[in-house]
């Protein structure tokens, strides 16, 4: 079956792993070197993990998984008892089943099949409702043709909200009611358009049932006036190219262009009455709704987190569903940078029975560091639950009975994640793992927070264990990745270390270094910088580092590159000041930091300062371009993959968050664009530009314009190399494009390592061309 198989958890109880993990990445015990085929063509050594779909309608600790025979099975981790929910031969559409969602009372299953991917998160599918007792199933819509965009169970009752052709519908015990009738190419109800899916909500839905199931809040997006961008597909998934390319037309607002307008509506499930909520925190053309959350146990209050267009002003607007009256209960000025949409609002209610106020929990960085706060639903000053020069990265679960919030933070170091709980009644903080040891943890909690699967994510080989929140001893091991531990014994792996590089300005940059196997300080090694560097991003972490292309270039005896990944200013989890420094000037400080790091690396005796490369993808490709443009001489090779070259070409909601509008920052946009060519002319080993022609995110336009600039200004063909990947999107994988890309990159690195300082050049590079 195509849906994820969530395998049966191990029954035997173990108190500890057979092989304890170390606070550093493994280096292997053997002599084998990683090969291209093992790291790129197929990642042969890859740890696995298991996830479960915790059930809210059963005893806490129950979850559902697909057994080896394909049947849906419910198991309780306390009793180790299991029962079949749906036999494999009774699953509707059989092997075409793509995913499933269990009704909260376990009476029915909602199946998706015949799915077609749309954008990063969204897909179209057919949906079926199956009764668990009779095993009979019915289509959500009798005439469905793989065209339903989203469907979701209500938490109470036998109701499903779903979206088809951008219109909202409600399914009640088999009866379908159409709620909206103006959905179409320019109007979306309950699902996001491209830009909200990609940049704001990060998901494929825009509807939320109230906790009691009596109301549904949903967003609508009107794209009237939003400019269209056309992506051409030359092969269109055919063996022989059609005479005319297939064209995908996307409403794609670029900088200073018209954005979609957004509204919040409230649907009474029983009466089917719809009211538009008055979210007038900003003018309609200046409004972004980033989050919707019910601040109630029933349906009395719903809140919208509203931002202005450039996302440096924020207001939380609470709406009373009975009166449809809106009140601003929280506001924030973030004009020193930007305000991230963290999607972290969680209702907890009154803290004490005598309290008149109810509260919700949210993450805010208004102190300069991202921390947990209690916010009164009626408005007022927030109460801090955590504080310090470190950041809370996510809320994992809230146990309202014990009044505990479970969260991850960088308290030990910005490159690490440790698991804690904090009481929102006593403010006591408790680590659930040893937070004095370098590690990268995460966890998945049961519906009532009584149990959790703890995942050790690195730097050593990952594993998972099952815990009860009443004990610090594991109930059992879920995944030990013993196979990976055994595999790596035969290899000599790159040695990964971490350090902080001080800047002259006083800040420090996190650096992850890979040294080739068998490293000797008596040799000289070329070095490859591999930045991403985008706002709020983080590449330097103590996660398990995949044995991928970066491991290969350090391992291949004909390459043996040292690699440095440097998180420059603007990246995340080091405080607001550090990340906000790049506001209105993307590409400036980031490039300065990468150049400074390269200059420091060049002073290391075992680094070959004549062969220092840099390669980045997406924002990393843009950053590589800006580094070369600086003409610092610090780098001798650049590989630029799927870059932005001019921020006017990218979408408005991402770009204006950091750069603000073109009319208020024209100089900043001009400086941030790649405009100067001398650095490209002077980079000794040349550079390579790669891009997919079907990229619907960072459009091929960026690389086309960059190459035109460089050619037009006389950059020689010895220096300028470019590669287009037909119909590939931002990930570059279509028709073998991914393997080709990495082969090409390996070839460039080999050529750079063996490049002599005196390069033989054709005569046209030795003198100016005459008209």
Curated annotation (Swiss-Prot):
Annotated GO CC locations: extracellular region; plasma membrane
Tagged with keyword Protease: yes
Predominant location: secreted
InterPro entries xrefs: AB_hydrolase_fold, Peptidase_S9_cat, Peptidase_S9B_N, Serine_Prot_S9B/DPPIV
Listed GO biological process terms: proteolysis; proteolysis involved in protein catabolic process
Gene3D superfamilies noted in UniProt: alpha/beta hydrolase, Dipeptidylpeptidase IV, N-terminal domain
Location(s), subcellular: Secreted
EC number(s) from the headed UniProt entry: 3.4.14.5
Catalyzed reactions per annotation: Release of an N-terminal dipeptide, Xaa-Yaa-|-Zaa-, from a polypeptide, preferentially when Yaa is Pro, provided Zaa is neither Pro nor hydroxyproline
Residues annotated as the enzyme's active site: 618 (charge relay system), 695 (charge relay system), 730 (charge relay system)
Molecular function in Gene Ontology: aminopeptidase activity; dipeptidyl-peptidase activity; serine-type peptidase activity
Comment on pH dependence: Optimum pH is 7.0. is active between pH 4.0 and 9.0.
Pfam families: DPPIV_N, Peptidase_S9
Assigned keywords, A-Z: Aminopeptidase, Glycoprotein, Hydrolase, Protease, Secreted, Serine protease, Signal
Signal peptide: 1-16
Residues with glycosylation annotation: 37, 80, 114, 173, 222, 470, 495
Intrachain S-S bonds: none
Record family assignment: Belongs to the peptidase S9B family.
Task of the protein: Extracellular dipeptidyl-peptidase which removes N-terminal dipeptides sequentially from polypeptides having unsubstituted N-termini provided that the penultimate residue is proline.
Name of this protein: Dipeptidyl peptidase 4
């Amino acid at each position: 079956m195509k849906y994820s198989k969530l395998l049966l958890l191990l029954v035997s109880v173990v108190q500890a792993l057979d092989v304890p993990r170390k606070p550093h990445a493994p280096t292997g015990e053997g002599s084998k070197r990683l090969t291209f085929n093992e790291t790129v063509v197929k990642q042969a050594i890859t740890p696995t993990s298991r996830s479960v779909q915790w059930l809210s309608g059963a005893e806490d600790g129950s979850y559902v998984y697909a057994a080896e025979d394909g049947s849906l099975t419910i198991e309780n981790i306390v009793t180790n008892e299991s029962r079949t929910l749906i036999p494999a031969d009774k699953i509707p559409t059989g092997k075409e089943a793509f995913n499933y969602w269990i009704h909260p009372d376990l009476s029915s299953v909602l199946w998706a099949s015949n799915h077609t991917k749309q954008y990063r998160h969204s897909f179209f599918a057919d949906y079926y409702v199956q009764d668990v007792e009779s095993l009979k199933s019915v289509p959500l819509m009798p005439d469905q043709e793989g065209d339903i965009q989203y469907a979701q169970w209500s938490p109470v009752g036998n109701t499903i909200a779903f979206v088809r052709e951008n219109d909202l519908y409600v399914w009640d015990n088999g009866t379908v009611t159409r709620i909206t009738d103006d959905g179409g190419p320019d109007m979306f109800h309950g699902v996001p358009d491209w830009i909200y899916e990609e940049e704001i909500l990060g998901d494929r839905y825009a509807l939320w049932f109230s906790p009691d199931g009596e109301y549904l809040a949903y967003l609508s997006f009107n794209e009237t006036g939003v400019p269209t961008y056309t992506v051409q597909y030359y092969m269109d998934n055919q063996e022989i190219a059609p005479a005319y390319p297939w064209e995908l037309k996307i409403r794609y607002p670029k900088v200073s262009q018209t954005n979609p307008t957004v509204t919040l509506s409230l649907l009474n499930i029983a009466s089917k009455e719809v009211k538009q909520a008055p979210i007038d925190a900003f003018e309609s053309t200046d409004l972004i709704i980033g989050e919707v959350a019910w601040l109630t146990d029933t349906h009395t209050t719903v809140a919208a987190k509203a931002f202005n267009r450039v996302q440096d002003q924020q207001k939380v607007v609470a709406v009373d569903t009975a009166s449809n009256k809106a009140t601003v209960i929280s506001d924030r000025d973030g004009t020193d940078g930007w305000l991230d949409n963290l999607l972290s609002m969680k209702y907890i209610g009154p803290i004490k029975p005598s309290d008149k106020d109810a509260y919700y929990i949210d993450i805010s960085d208004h102190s300069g560091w991202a921390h947990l706060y209690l916010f009164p639903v009626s408005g007022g000053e927030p109460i801090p639950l955590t504080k310090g020069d470190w950041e809370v990265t996510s809320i994992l679960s809230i146990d309202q009975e014990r009044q505990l919030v479970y969260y991850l933070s960088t308290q030990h170091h910005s490159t690490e994640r440790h698991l804690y709980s904090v009481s929102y009644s006593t403010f006591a903080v408790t680590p659930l793992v040893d937070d004095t040891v370098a590690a990268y943890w995460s966890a998945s909690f049961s519906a009532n927070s009584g149990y959790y699967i703890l995942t050790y994510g690195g730097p050593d080989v990952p594993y998972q264990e099952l815990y009860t929140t009443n004990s610090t001893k594991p109930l059992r091991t879920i995944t030990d990745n013993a196979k990976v531990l055994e595999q790596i014994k035969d290899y000599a792996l790159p040695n990964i270390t971490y350090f902080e590089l001080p800047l002259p300005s006083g800040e420090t940059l996190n650096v992850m270094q890979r040294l080739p196997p068998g490293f000797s300080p008596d040799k000289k090694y070329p070095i490859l910088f591999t930045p991403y560097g985008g706002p709020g991003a983080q590449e330097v972490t103590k996660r398990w580092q995949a044995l991928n292309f970066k491991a290969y270039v350090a391992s291949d005896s004909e390459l043996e590159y040292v690699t440095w990944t440097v998180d420059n200013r603007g990246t995340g989890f080091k405080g607001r000041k550090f990340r906000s420094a790049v506001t209105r000037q993307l590409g400036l400080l980031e490039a300065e930091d990468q150049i400074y790091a390269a200059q420091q690396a060049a002073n290391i005796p075992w680094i070959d300062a004549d062969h220092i490369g840099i390669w980045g993808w997406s924002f990393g490709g843009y950053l590589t371009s800006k580094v070369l443009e600086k003409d610092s001489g610090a780098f001798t090779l650049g590989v630029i993959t799927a870059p932005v070259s001019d921020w006017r070409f990218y979408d408005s909601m991402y770009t204006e968050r950091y750069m603000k509008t073109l009319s208020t920052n024209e100089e900043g946009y001009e400086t941030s664009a790649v405009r100067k060519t001398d650095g490209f002319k002077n980079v000794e080993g040349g550079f390579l530009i790669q891009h997919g022609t079907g990229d619907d995110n960072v459009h091929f336009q960026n690389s086309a314009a960059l190459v035109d600039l460089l050619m037009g200004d006389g950059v020689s063909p010895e220096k300028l190399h470019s590669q287009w990947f037909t119909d590939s999107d931002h990930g570059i994988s279509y028709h073998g494009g991914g393997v080709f890309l990495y082969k090409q990159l390996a070839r460039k690195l080999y050529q750079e390592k063996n490049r002599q300082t005196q390069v033989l050049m054709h005569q046209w590079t030795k003198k100016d061309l005459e008209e």
